[in-house]
Amino acid sequence: LSITLSIQAQKKKDKKEEPPKWDVANPGDDFNYKPHSFTTNEGTWMNLDVSPNGQTIAFDLLGDIYTMPITGGKAKAIRTGIPFEIQPRFSPNGTKISFTSDAGGGDNIWVMNVDGSDAKQITKEDFRLLNNAIWTPDGNYLIARKHFTSRRSVGAGEMWQYHITGGSGLQLTKRKNDQQDVNEPFISADGKYLYYSEDIYPGGYFQYNKDPNKQIYAIQRYSFEDGKTETITGGPGGAARPTVSPDGKMLAFVKRVRTKSVLYIHNLETGEEWPIYDSLNKDQQEAWAIFGVYPNFDWMPNNTELVFWSGGKILKININTLAITNIPF
């Protein structure tokens, strides 16, 4: 009897001594976390997305996620707190939003309802972390950039596909080395192609002091039908952050022109391309841009307007008239 009691006591003691599981969102009283309130009408490096019906914008600001009407106005916070959460993307039917979050201890892809409720972690990587997710047109899968490193910390990316129920994922692209990045995935509305940016600077490794007016990044297109990849655009000034219009005819992207980062349009039918806005914030082509060379932007459903972040503001541009509209928040 005394032996049985001793074993039971030891089990209770071991159970009591088990440390509590770490929760990024609730680190405990000793963290001395203090919330702060402020009002602003501008933000830094804001990723954004437009809902499929063109009525709502989702954007991130300082690691929190907000939504607001396409006309602007008071933004509604749908994800706040200690976790750093960015890169919201509406699902094709407009009922869900995917985003990158470190709430699970490292950057992974999560999905929530458009009001911020019922947030769920989709990917559960604890080493090869993920960001920049984009939905497939059927709404059943997410494709994201997975980060790989070796002896040098800069690392490189690969494109991986995950079902919205989770799982270990499916590799779509293979990194050519461990230092030149692949990033910024975007899927055509017909689901035939995956566009992404790739560091193709000569040398085969990450370098400082690269010349952005030569070519650092190019935009590649991966075919889901045959698995082949082709270069769509690049050249002097490079090309990054590919964003395809809903009708699949136009590709918006970022190019460096001398000292300016410029928003360009590429006609996917003719190959013609031209600049439409030359006052973007400086892109990160020369840097180690793990979250992308420029923040996410998006097309309006009408195929003639783009909504993007620049100079602290959310702007809308008509690609034909070049008329700019400020969307206040």
Give the predicted meaning of each segment.
Residues G28-F31:
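Short, C-terminally biased terminal segments at protein or domain edges
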Residues Y33-Y66:
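Beta-strand-rich domains and repeat architectures in extracellular enzymes and scaffolds
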Residues D49-Q55, P88-K96, A133-Y141, P185-Y193, ...:
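Blade-terminus and WD-like Trp-Asp/Gly-His loop motifs, strongest in beta-propeller folds
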Residues L1-K13:
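Bacterial Sec-dependent N-terminal signal peptides
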Residues P69:
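Periplasmic/extracellular electron-transfer cofactor-ligation site
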Residues K11-K16, P20, N41-E42, D60-Y66, ...:
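A flexible loop/linker signature enriched in serine peptidases of the S9 family
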